C-alpha cells in the first residue's frame, strides 16, 4: 500500500477517507462542509459533454500514413513526398445514430483522418462513400433533421427520410449506395474510405490540380444483410468497437491503400459533369486512381474519452501544398466543423492533447475559456498584437498558395439546373449483379415500411428514370414485403 499514490482533491489536498460521507452522527444528515463529496458529485454531473450533432457514435485508433508513390510534381506537401511517414488518428462513425445507437445499423459511415504533419495538422473528414445526399450546404440541416428523431414522437421517421429524398433527386446516388450491400459493412476494417469532396494540390511552380482521395481496404469488402445485422445487434450493440479494438490489440493491424485521382486545373471546363458536385464521382476511365501509399492503424487509444470523444476533425485544417475547391459543401464545412468544436469542446479545443499539432504553434489569439497556454502564443508577452517591434511571430509568404480561379455573378443559383442526377446512378446500377440488385430492392422496400403511398410513388419515378428494372424491382419488393399496391399515382408523385 505504501507504493500507491495518495488520492487527492483536484486542488491537491490528500483525501483521508474515500468511502464515507461526512455526517452528523452515524445516522445523521450530510454536512454541507463535506467539500470532498461536493467536488466528487459536481465532477460527475459534468462528465458528459454535448455529443456531436452528426457522427455521434464513433470508434478510433492511431496509426501512420506511409507514402510509397511519387506525386511531388503535383504537390509540395511534405507529408505526401516519397518516403514520408506521418503519425495519424482515424475515427469511424455512423451518421444518424446517437452515442447509444447500435453499430450495425444501415447508415453511411464517417471516415475521418487527422495527420500530425511537420507543417501542421491536416484533417481529411470523409465517409465510406464517394458521394453524399446533397450538393448545396443550405440543405444540410434539413437533411439531417430527417435522419434524426421526430420532434413529437421522438422516433426515427421513414416518412421524413423518403419524403425528403423523393423531393431531392440529387440524393439518389447516395441513397442507392446506402441501400446496396455497401450500406452495412461488417466492421470498420472492411470498408473503403473517401475524402468525398474535391480538394486541390499545388506545387512549388504555383500550378494547381484538382484531387480526390480514396482509401481502399486491404482486408477485403465484407457486408451484412439487414437480417445478419439485426442478429449481431441482438448479441452486441458495440460490434464495430469490439472488432476494431481487438484486431489492433491482437496485432492484426488494418491497412488501406491510399489513392488519388488528379485532374488538371482547366479540365473543369470540359467535363460533362460538375467536378465539384458532391453527388458525383469522377469516372476512373477519365482520371485513373494513382496509388501513393498505405494507411495503417496500429495503436488503440489509452482513454476513449480523451482521445476519441475529444478528437476534433475539421476540413479547414490543411497544410501547404493542399488546398480547397469551389465544392459548395466543402466550403460550408470549412466553417461549420470548427465552429461545432468550439461549441462542443470549447474555444481552445485545439489545445486538447489529441488535437494539438506536433509542430510549433504561434499565433495572436488570446484569453477565452480554458486558455491553458499562458495567455498568448507569441513567445513574448509584449508581442500581443501584430505588427509589432518585439520579435513576435511573422507571416510566411512562402506558404501562400496560387490564386484560385473563380468567376460568375453573385446569385442564389438553382443547384438542380444543368445537373443530371440519373446518369451516374444508372452506371452504378449497371455494375450490380442479380444478387446485388435483389438485395438493393429488398433493402429499399424494408426501409419504406409505413411510408405514405404518394411518397413511395414519387420515389419510384426517380428509380424508373435510372432504369425501368430499378423501379420494377423495388415495386415487386414492396408488394412482397408489405403487400403494397398503388391504387393511383397522386398529383404529388406526378
UniProtKB/Swiss-Prot annotation:
Its EC number is 1.11.1.6. The active site is at residues 55, 127. Heme binds at residue 337. The keyword DNA damage does not apply. Keywords: Heme, Hydrogen peroxide, Iron, Metal-binding, Oxidoreductase, Periplasm, Peroxidase. It is found in: Periplasm. GO terms for biological process: hydrogen peroxide catabolic process; response to hydrogen peroxide. Its cofactor is heme. SUPFAM superfamilies: Heme-dependent catalase-like. CDD domains: catalase_clade_3 (cd08156). The keyword Oxidoreductase applies. Gene3D superfamilies: Catalase core domain. Pfam families: Catalase (PF00199), Catalase-rel (PF06628). Belongs to the catalase family. This is Catalase A.
Amino acid at each position: 500500500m505504501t507504493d500507491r499514490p495518495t488520492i487527492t482533491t483536484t486542488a491537491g489536498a490528500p483525501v483521508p477517507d474515500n468511502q464515507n460521507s461526512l455526517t452528523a452522527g452515524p445516522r445523521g444528515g450530510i454536512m454541507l462542509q463535506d467539500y470532498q463529496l461536493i467536488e466528487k458529485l459536481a465532477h460527475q454531473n459534468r462528465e458528459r459533454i454535448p455529443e456531436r450533432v452528426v457522427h455521434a457514435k464513433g470508434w478510433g485508433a492511431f496509426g501512420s500514413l506511409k507514402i510509397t508513390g511519387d506525386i511531388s510534381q503535383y504537390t509540395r506537401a511534405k507529408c505526401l513526398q516519397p518516403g514520408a511517414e506521418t503519425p495519424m488518428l482515424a475515427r469511424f462513425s455512423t451518421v444518424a445514430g446517437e452515442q447509444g445507437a447500435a453499430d450495425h445499423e444501415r447508415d453511411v459511415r464517417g471516415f475521418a483522418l487527422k495527420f500530425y504533419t511537420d507543417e501542421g495538422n491536416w484533417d481529411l473528414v470523409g465517409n465510406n462513400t464517394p458521394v453524399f445526399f446533397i450538393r448545396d450546404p443550405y440543405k444540410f440541416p434539413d437533411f439531417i433533421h430527417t435522419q434524426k428523431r421526430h420532434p413529437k414522437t421522438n422516433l426515427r421517421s421513414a416518412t421524413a427520410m423518403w419524403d425528403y429524398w423523393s423531393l431531392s433527386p440529387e440524393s439518389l446516388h447516395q441513397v442507392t449506395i446506402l441501400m446496396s450491400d455497401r450500406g452495412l459493412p461488417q466492421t470498420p476494417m472492411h470498408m473503403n474510405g473517401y475524402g468525398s469532396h474535391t480538394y486541390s494540390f499545388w506545387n512549388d511552380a504555383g500550378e494547381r490540380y484538382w484531387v480526390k482521395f480514396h482509401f481502399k481496404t486491404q482486408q477485403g469488402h465484407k457486408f451484412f444483410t439487414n437480417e445478419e445485422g439485426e442478429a449481431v445487434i441482438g448479441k452486441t450493440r458495440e460490434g464495430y468497437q469490439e472488432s476494431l479494438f481487438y484486431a489492433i490489440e491482437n496485432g492484426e493491424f488494418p491497412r488501406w491503400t491510399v489513392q488519388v485521382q488528379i485532374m488538371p486545373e482547366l479540365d473543369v471546363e470540359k467535363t460533362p459533369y460538375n467536378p465539384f458536385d458532391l453527388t458525383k464521382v469522377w469516372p476512373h476511365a477519365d482520371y485513373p486512381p494513382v496509388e501513393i501509399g498505405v494507411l495503417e492503424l496500429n495503436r488503440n487509444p489509452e482513454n476513449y474519452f480523451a482521445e476519441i470523444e475529444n478528437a476534433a476533425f475539421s476540413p479547414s485544417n490543411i497544410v501547404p501544398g493542399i488546398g480547397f475547391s469551389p465544392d459548395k459543401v466543402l466550403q460550408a464545412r470549412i466553417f461549420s466543423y470548427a465552429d461545432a468544436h468550439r461549441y462542443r469542446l470549447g474555444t481552445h479545443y485545439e489545445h486538447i492533447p489529441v488535437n494539438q499539432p506536433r509542430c510549433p504553434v504561434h499565433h495572436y489569439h488570446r484569453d477565452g475559456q480554458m486558455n491553458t497556454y499562458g495567455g498568448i502564443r507569441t513567445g513574448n508577452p509584449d508581442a500581443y498584437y501584430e505588427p509589432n517591434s518585439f520579435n513576435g511571430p511573422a507571416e510566411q509568404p512562402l506558404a501562400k498558395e496560387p490564386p484560385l480561379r473563380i468567376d460568375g455573378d453573385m446569385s442564389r443559383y438553382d443547384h438542380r439546373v444543368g445537373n443530371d442526377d440519373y446518369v451516374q446512378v444508372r452506371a452504378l446500377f449497371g455494375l450490380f449483379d442479380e444478387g446485388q440488385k435483389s438485395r438493393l430492392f429488398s433493402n429499399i422496400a424494408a426501409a419504406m415500411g409505413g411510408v405514405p403511398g404518394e411518397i413511395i410513388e414519387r420515389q419510384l419515378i426517380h428509380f424508373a428514370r435510372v432504369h425501368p428494372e430499378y423501379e420494377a424491382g423495388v415495386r415487386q419488393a414492396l408488394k412482397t414485403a408489405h403487400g403494397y399496391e398503388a391504387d393511383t399515382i397522386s398529383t404529388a408523385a406526378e
